[in-house]
A protein has these predicted regions:
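Cytosolic nucleotide-utilizing catalytic cores of signal-transduction proteins
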Residues: 114-119, 141-146, 160
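N-terminal positioning helix adjacent to the helix-turn-helix/winged-helix DNA-binding module
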Residues: 97, 143-151, 187, 196-199
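N-terminal regulatory/effector-sensing and dimerization cores
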Residues: 1-86
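Basic/polar phosphate-binding segments, predominantly the helix-turn-helix DNA-binding elements
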Residues: 134, 162-198
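Short, intrinsically disordered, charge-balanced linker/junction segments flanking boundaries
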Residues: 67-70, 109-112, 196, 200-206
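Amphipathic alpha-helical segments enriched in hydrophobic/aromatic residues interleaved with Lys/Arg
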Residues: 79-137, 153
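Short alpha-helical segment immediately N-terminal to, or the first helix within
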Residues: 154-158, 193, 205-206
Length: 206
């Protein structure tokens, strides 16, 4: 999936795909764990598979970015690295990005969805040029242990099963009322809506 769109707030979530975001105008905040990373035009962010992340827009004006979402089979030889490692600092600043990378990202945007082999080849170029600029650490070192991240991780690990809010709260060691408030305040939807969205997103990315 490759789209250029107006940047917006996106709640904490994770998926088993690589996500690359390139700011094309204005600014964007990329949240990973409890850290919020500021991005400006030309900066490129990398979110490896199964890393919880979110986006915030704090800058007035026109804020746009290109988002590339690549399933594991399209990242070929980089897939093994991305399963166990993640960037310590997930942003490559614009001054460190070769012009070729922007050209290739634009080429991916213009590639027909049916031309998966072409898009995959372009993606290999982006990764070959950029992965070496990221300091990779064990994935377990990237993230957070707070309740928001425990919640996202729990849903991601268990959404294929049948379970209730009460069962989830018990497993996380909190009351169901605390968990219910978390869904409404942080995710702006109830438990069932969030769980159904996770199942739908999985079906769409298969």
């Amino acid at each position: 999936i490759a789209i250029n769109r107006k940047s917006k707030h996106i709640e904490p979530h994770l998926h088993n795909a690589l996500e690359i975001v390139c700011v094309t105008s204005g600014a964007l905040e990329l949240g990973v764990g409890q850290e919020l990373y500021h991005m400006e035009k030309g900066d490129i962010g990398f979110v490896f598979p199964d890393v919880i992340h979110h986006y915030q827009v704090l800058t007035p004006g026109v804020n746009k970015a290109t988002y590339l979402i690549a399933s594991p089979f399209t990242i070929a030889k980089f897939a093994d690295i991305m399963q166990s490692m993640a960037p310590e600092y997930p942003i490559i600043k614009a001054e460190k990005v070769e012009p070729e990378v922007y050209r290739v990202i634009n080429a991916i945007l213009e590639t027909e969805q049916s031309d998966i082999t072409v898009a995959q080849a372009y993606l290999q170029i982006v990764l070959a040029r950029c992965i070496g600029k990221l300091n990779l650490v064990e994935k377990s070192n990237v993230g957070s242990n707070d309740l928001i991240y425990q919640t996202v991780s729990y849903i991601s690990a268990n959404f294929k099963k049948k379970f209730s809010l009460e069962e989830m709260a018990k497993d996380l060691g909190v009351s169901k009322y605390v968990l219910s408030r978390l869904f409404s305040k942080t995710f702006h939807r109830n438990f069932n809506q969030y769980l159904n969205d996770a199942r739908l997103n999985y079906a769409c990315h298969r």
